[in-house]
Design a protein with these regions (language model features):
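Extended, largely alpha-helical regulatory/partner-binding modules appended to the mid-to-C-terminal parts
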Residues: 9, 34, 67, 71-78, ...
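P-loop/Walker A NTP-binding region and its immediately flanking N-terminal helices
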Residues: 1-162, 172
Length: 299
């Protein structure tokens, strides 16, 4: 339930769990804020869940109430170890893991190592890890997360089941933000949500963080204008005027308008990005007029 917009991965995991073919190592890749670490924790819960009655097996729908689920959720499970490779890149840190791998899990079904930003490990650290990945003990599982999959050696990747977490689709993101806003009892305009969705570029974490800022910025209903100001975007009406001048070939007026927007505090880079968005929107609407009604592609 914590995973938004990752149906293909959930389906693959469910099939693997049901067939009792759980990989020894997983690697999650995707842009920031798509749920890599969340997924890693859910998989860890699923592998060690014993169900509310204490007799359940591995599942893709962990109960969330058994001792293992609760301990993993609170980050205090003795058999589920999380390590941030960004701050512990050396071979000594990995050796520590390798030495502890031989010992069985203290209380859970599996001993699980979650290594975040795994691409930050040094070459020597990867080499040390490789031997364990080649011949892992039955009771050990590795879950790696990375935003830079190209920096992970092929020898490591070939021993992992890989999941590419997609950018979250705009309509899914808007539905998520509406749900959060309703839970917070916050009023926020639909076009304001569309602006936040575009700015987040498919990252749920960025979107929820921007939504928090927008709600605290707005008194009463948060409008698109308030969100635009918060994001440092140029005034949309003035961008449309500028676009019209460019289309007319009126260079003098366009440069004068751009200078005026700059004087009023608009970031020239943001203006150019907005112009590119308007150009894209006009092109899309010319080809598929119905797109004009879609809030996620509006100018």
């Amino acid at each position: 339930t914590d995973l938004v917009g990752q149906e293909a991965m959930v389906r693959t995991l469910r099939n693997a769990f049901e067939a009792d073919r759980i990989a020894q190592a997983f690697v999650m890749t995707g842009i920031r804020g798509t749920g890599k670490t969340t997924t890693a924790r859910i998989i860890a819960k699923g592998m060690n869940c014993i169900g509310a009655d204490g007799s359940g097996g591995p599942t893709t729908e962990p109960c969330g109430t058994c001792e293992h689920c609760v301990a993993i959720m609170e980050g205090r499970h003795v058999d589920v170890l999380e390590m941030d490779a960004a701050s512990r890149t050396g071979v000594d840190d990995i050796r520590e893991i390798i030495e502890s791998v031989q010992y069985r899990a203290a209380s859970a079904r599996y001993k699980i190592y979650i290594i975040d930003e795994v691409h930050m490990l040094s070459t020597n650290a990867f080499n040390a890890l490789l031997k364990t990945l080649e011949e892992p003990p039955e009771h050990v599982k590795f879950i790696f997360a990375t935003t830079e999959i190209r920096k992970v050696p092929v020898t490591v990747l070939s021993r992992c089941q890989r999941f590419d977490l997609r950018r979250i689709e705009p309509d899914v993101m808007i539905a998520l933000l509406k749900k959060i806003a309703a839970a917070e009892q916050a009023e926020i305009a639909a076009d304001a949500l569309a602006l936040i969705t575009r700015a987040a570029e498919g990252s749920a974490r960025d979107a929820t963080s921007l939504l928090d800022q927008a709600i605290s910025h707005g008194a009463g209903e948060t409008s698109a204008e308030q969100v635009r100001a918060m994001l440092g975007l140029a005034d949309r009406g003035r961008v449309m005027d500028l676009f019209e001048m460019i289309m007319r070939g009126d260079a003098a007026s366009a440069l004068s308008e751009l200078g005026g927007q700059y004087a009023d505090g608009a970031n020239p880079l943001a203006v150019m990005r907005d112009l590119a968005e308007v150009t894209h929107w006009v092109s899309v609407v010319k080809i598929t007029p119905d797109a004009g009604e879609d809030p996620t592609v509006s100018p």
